[in-house]
Amino acid sequence: MKIFLSSHGHLASGLKSSLEILYGNCDHITVFDAYVDENSVQEQIELFFETVEEDQQILLISDLYGSSVNQAMSMYLDRPSTTLVAGANLAFLIGLMGRDSITREELKDLIEQSREMLCIVNLEEEEPSSQEDFF
């Protein structure tokens, strides 16, 4: 599985930096920080797809559903074995680590788990039950 992660500003490279601190080398993840220079999302996705092998599963991940970055990435959904996920967060990306592939059902479960990691933390409440299972 190859991953293309893009965001407005430096969020994408920051998320990859965090993953590399936790997991080491993440060569299977290509990042593009949009709107920080003259390069476009479309140009970078085209370069990314030049590195993709015919039988590889592709996961495109954007920071925000419906945004310009997400819309640009959606133009590539007609490519074989390509899926687009919006709303990148570190919990979601951690769940992808160590996987060679992921089914649609597993992807839905991982998205739900990563949503649960976004919560208000109160001292008197227990941590979400899925947190132990997640890590």
Feature locations, PLM:
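N-terminal loops that bind phosphate or other acidic moieties
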Residues: 2-135
